[in-house]
């Protein structure tokens, strides 16, 4: 790894560190051999002399505090009751419907007034065309279908609006608002598709957007955690995918964790080597260190006492010589 190198022959690791392109490609080959036949193999290409690597990056959850998810789901549709809905229509349709009506395909266009309460899931606002047409026609195919439609339509506007506000999704699943705050299982792994030009902050933003987390990327950090317990924070200017390749493909040895920025700290190698020991063993280490410290103190004390004695004797000799 060198500094201030030509971009044609080197690839940046951070804003000030570089690695030889040939060396990185060799590590990439090893990485892909490890993941052979799996979706975690990485692809690479060159654009204007710049090497770009892309693929899936595994990130483990290492949060201690709960996170809050966005309450709105852009893809959810909520049907609000129509202002022109009359409950008596149900009995009217059941009474006057002919046997042929029960065979009408569900895809036929409706002829009822528009239901203006339908909300788009994609966040683009109300569906304009559906506001001008009837979203659903009360069918007489079965009594059950009519009852279902009636239940859907009979909600008060305030109740339906409350349901719409109190639902959200994560990974396509809808949850009640009471579960919008949760803590992912420690060590559970997710992944995002990234490339080697994406910085730590960009990867964090991508991951949080994927799970619709309300908290901003500044509240989190990415750490490389070694099997030994050594823990190193990825700087904002670093590239997580490059870091993953440099640490090797085996996640039993090194994992990339998402952690809180204010609750996590780096653990150097000198400290990490003691992490896995039990408390009695650590206590014995401390006792031995104290004993060694006492011996060193005694040794230094005796040394300086001897030096002081020598200096005093010399001073006395000089005084007598005068």
Swiss-Prot record:
Domain Ras-associating per the UniProt entry, residue ranges: 175-263
Domain of life: Eukaryota
Signal sequence coordinates: none
Entries under InterPro entries matching the protein: RA_dom, RASSF1-6, RASSF4_RA, SARAH_dom, Ubiquitin-like_domsf
Alphabetized Pfam families for the sequence: Nore1-SARAH, RA
Modified residues (Phosphoserine): 142
Functional note: Potential tumor suppressor. May act as a KRAS effector protein. May promote apoptosis and cell cycle arrest.
Name assigned to this protein: Ras association domain-containing protein 4
Organism: Rattus norvegicus
Encoding gene, per UniProt annotation: Rassf4
């Amino acid at each position: 790894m060198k500094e201030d190198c030509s971009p044609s022959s080197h690839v940046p690791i951070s804003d000030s560190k570089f690695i030889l392109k040939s060396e990185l490609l060799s590590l990439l080959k090893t990485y892909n051999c490890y993941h052979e036949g799996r979706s975690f193999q990485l692809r690479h290409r060159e654009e204007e002399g710049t090497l770009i690597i892309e693929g899936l990056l595994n990130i483990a959850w290492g949060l201690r505090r709960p996170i809050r998810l966005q309450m709105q789901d852009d893809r959810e549709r909520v049907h609000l009751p129509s202002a022109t809905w009359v409950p008596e229509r149900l009995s009217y349709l059941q009474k006057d419907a002919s046997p042929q009506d029960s065979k009408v395909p569900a895809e036929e266009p409706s002829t009822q007034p528009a239901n203006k309460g339908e909300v788009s899931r994609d966040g683009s606002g109300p569906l304009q065309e559906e506001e001008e047409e009837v979203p659903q026609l009360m069918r007489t195919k079965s009594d059950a279908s009519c009852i279902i439609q009636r239940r859907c339509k009979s909600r008060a506007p305030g109740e339906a609006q409350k349901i719409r506000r109190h639902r959200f999704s994560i990974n396509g699943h809808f949850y009640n608002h009471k579960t919008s705050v949760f803590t992912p299982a420690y060590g559970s792994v997710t992944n995002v598709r990234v490339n080697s030009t994406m910085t730590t902050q960009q990867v964090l933003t991508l991951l949080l957007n994927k799970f619709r987390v309300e908290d901003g990327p500044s509240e989190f950090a990415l750490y490389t955690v070694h099997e030994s317990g050594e823990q190193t924070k990825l700087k904002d200017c670093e590239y997580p995918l490059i870091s993953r390749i440099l640490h090797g493909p085996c996640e039993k040895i090194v994992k990339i964790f998402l952690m809180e920025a204010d609750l996590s700290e780096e653990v150097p190698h000198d400290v990490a080597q003691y992490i896995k020991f039990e408390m009695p063993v650590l206590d014995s280490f401390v006792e031995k260190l104290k004993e060694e410290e006492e011996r060193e103190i005694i040794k230094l004390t005796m040394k300086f006492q001897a030096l002081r004695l020598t200096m005093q004797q010399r001073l006395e000799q000089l005084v007598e010589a005068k």
